[in-house]
Amino acid sequence: MEAENGEGQVQVHLKTKQEHYAVPDVPYAIEGSVSTTELNIFLNALLQNKGAASVDFDFLVFDEYLRGRLCDHLREKAISFEDAIEIEYVERFPAPEPQDCLLHDDWVSAVKASGKWILTGCYDNTINIWTNKGKHILTIPGHTAPIKAVDWLSLDEVNGRFVSTSQDQTAMLWQWNIDSNAVDCVSVCKGHERSVDSVAVSPDAQRFATGSWDTMLKLWSAELEDAVEGSAKRAKESGVRTPKMTLQGHRESISAVQWMDGTTLLTGSWDHTLKVWDLNLEGIKTEISTNKSIFDANFSKLNRLIVTASADKNLRLYDPRTNQGSVVRNTYLGHNAWVQTVMWSTTEEFLFVSGSYDNQNKLWDCRSPKAPLYDLLGHGEKVLDIDWSNPKYIVSGGADNTVRVFKSRKATVDHMETK
């Protein structure tokens, strides 16, 4: 058929879940050579007949974003050009805007945003607290080696509590009085024998988990008044805290740890595996083998999928629920060097961000494996950590001694819905 060469026409149905942008459900004849640009012109012409303003859309054809000509996309999917093709369109997620550059004295290896605050960890052994408007609030010494990870335990108008981990083999629990801007180290957590590279706080904020270069996964109490008995009394009095549980199973460094729920942990490792741990059973529930060292891994509570960052420039998508969990659901191409860090959006089901040794952050839709939605530029050296915990801000730290803050501008459609 001529359409296969991009010269003929294809019958399509245009569908959307965003009802305020719906067009009549009738077949439309369009050129097989169309791309997203031409489809946007065609669709907006239909919508303008309804009095709508011009809108940028992305187009899903058989569950994947169209990133070239329609005829090439159909051929790649082995879809018959004789059939009527259903194309789903969605309002394009707007490009995040660069907002701030927070200058530090050394590499920024850890970032975590919550509310109006940004917590950062540096290679000069310090932790820093900033506002999301770029004002520096506090520099916190205490560790004796570079910081590797940070996470908030709790945060309200009066107090903030957080945990930091370091190459000095410890985790530290901190209490910050926001009014007086004073911070105290509540406990030093000792038990790892190498650098503590990852940390995650439980959903109820009563515990936290750490992953280390010593291959061990450890669980700790995060409570201020942690009851200790017998021989551990002296440790309590000195402010030293010991692990509640140690889980062995990885063969190399644990680079990522995350709570999937209150009793389940996800870890990623340089040993090429993802492991899902059942804390009630104190053992491994699921293991996913990959073909590369995992530098970071993140689980989405919205879509239940895991995305990984690896040494071969690619990001990969896995489904831990299937018997074929080790089968890669998708591979995302776009970075030009090691991908160091990755995180799902906490509010947008299909979106995630990544940071790489190519000095770039990228914003992805998991349905678009061939190209990211946007490049988030600004870093002058490799990106070491990225965070999208606060839906309004994408925050990244790098070897250029800066934190870059990008404001996420979600598309506003409320005015359309009320018309």
Curated annotation (Swiss-Prot):
The protein's location, in the record's own words, is:
Nucleus, Nucleolus; Nucleus, Nucleoplasm
Keyword Transmembrane helix annotated: no
What SUPFAM superfamilies does the record tag this protein with? WD40 repeat-like
GO CC annotation terms, alphabetical: nucleoplasm; PeBoW complex; preribosome, large subunit precursor
Q: Which residues form the signal peptide?
A: none
GO aspect biological process, one term = maturation of 5.8S rRNA from tricistronic rRNA transcript (SSU-rRNA, 5.8S rRNA, LSU-rRNA)
Main subcellular location: nucleus
One GO MF term: ribonucleoprotein complex binding
Residue ranges, annotated region (Ubiquitin-like (UBL) domain):
10-91
WD repeat residue intervals: 103-141, 142-184, 191-230, 249-287, 289-328, 334-374, 378-416
Keyword set, alphabetical order: Nucleus, Repeat, Ribosome biogenesis, rRNA processing, WD repeat
* Cystine crosslinks: none
**CDD domains, alphabetically?**
WD40 (cd00200)
InterPro entries given in the database record = G-protein_beta_WD-40_rep, NLE, WD40/YVTN_repeat-like_dom_sf, WD40_repeat_CS, WD40_repeat_dom_sf, WD40_rpt, WDR12/Ytm1
Query: What PANTHER family does the database record attribute to this sequence?
Result: RIBOSOME BIOGENESIS PROTEIN WDR12 (PTHR19855:SF11), WD40 REPEAT PROTEIN 12, 37 (PTHR19855)
Q: What does this protein do?
A: Required for maturation of ribosomal RNAs and formation of the large ribosomal subunit.
Family designation: Belongs to the WD repeat WDR12/YTM1 family.
Its protein name is Ribosome biogenesis protein WDR12 homolog
Source organism of the structure: Drosophila grimshawi (Hawaiian fruit fly)
